[in-house]
Amino acid sequence: MLQQIDKKQKLFIYLFFLLLLTTFNNLSLSNSEYLKLKINQIKVSGLNSKNNIQISEEFNKLLHQKNIFFISKDHFINILEKNNLIHSFKVRKIYPNSIEVQIKKTELLAVTNRNNKKFFIGSNGKLINFESYNKSLPYVFGKIKIKDFIEFKKIIAKSKFNFEEISELYFFPSGRWDIKNNKGILIKLPETNLLKALNLAYQITINEIFKNDKVIDLRIYNYVISTNE
């Protein structure tokens, strides 16, 4: 009986100290400086100055004076995913009160037209509003799905062609592609076996026998039709 009383007394003492410590910790936490670490600076880098400032201002509206400990990547995703120039990003918390957003800009691959308006095609699979650009990019004709263009570009990258040598790409409803190189040679490709056809076309374009030809037609299996018109 005495042992049972001792056990009850010990249990009571343990519970008392636990309650006391919990109360103490909660009071300490509520007065802690950690809860006063409010964000007062968000630095964005990776795009041009105009875009960096614009994104930074959007973040400041959303996150200014919020506690840095309670900010997660999800707070940034909605804003950053709206910007088609962004390929990827990293967010760094710099304690006590700053955040850095490092952006990797998408690569501009080509130019195309949608509803009589020009757009860049980005490596992130998105269309980007067209503006002046100091690099020559190929023009893509036809109603393309961006993912189909990117897949075709990957095939070109595996071939002997350099993508920078291509000035125009034509996409047809059947799913077939034509390309024109910087020398003005139009290459009509088959619907299948594109890599093989591209490598054959490249060999023809550098062959002296075909130096005056302007059209290379590879649409028919095992046939090469070339003309100078």
Could you describe each region identified by the protein language model?
Residues M1-E229:
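Charged, solvent-exposed interaction patches on well-folded alpha/beta domains
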